Curated annotation (Swiss-Prot):
This is Small ribosomal subunit protein uS7. One of its GO terms (biological process) is translation. One of its GO terms (cellular component) is small ribosomal subunit. The keyword Membrane does not apply. Belongs to the universal ribosomal protein uS7 family. The keyword RNA-binding applies. One of its GO terms (molecular function) is rRNA binding. The lineage of its organism: Bacteria, Pseudomonadati, Spirochaetota, Spirochaetia, Spirochaetales. Part of the 30S ribosomal subunit. Contacts proteins S9 and S11.
Amino acid sequence: MSRKNKKIKKKIFVDTRYNSRIVAKFANRMMYDGKKSISESILYSSIDLLADKLEDSDKMAVFCKALDNIKPLVEVRSRRVGGATYQVPVEVREERREALAMKWIIFAARKASGRSMKEKLSNELLNAYNSTGAAFKKKEDTHRMAEANKAFTHYRW
């Protein structure tokens, strides 16, 4: 039996504008140097820009659909068996799927050149909504890698 204590999960509070845990988590992931207000203002303005581009009234539905399009179903993990390292495909927990999707969208937005962060983030969210862009490509690459290594699924733990 494990002697380690279970890690107590930190409670994420909902954000002020949309009363959503997902938006609050996204703002926390975007944050630099503890400057949450800046992170939130960038996120809120990029969601507004996204809704204006799509002319959709329900901003949260658009944001959630963009996030859902990026969530990976499977990923590969390295497993060492008898001196050889195999890339073993495993299913991704819902919590990790959400975290990976947020991470990929933010990374793709930061990597885009020029313009302000709110414009880059709204463009990346729009691309995610339309199942295109760098974050979606990252998801497809992850799925392709898992598909290529499907033969090693019996090494799962």
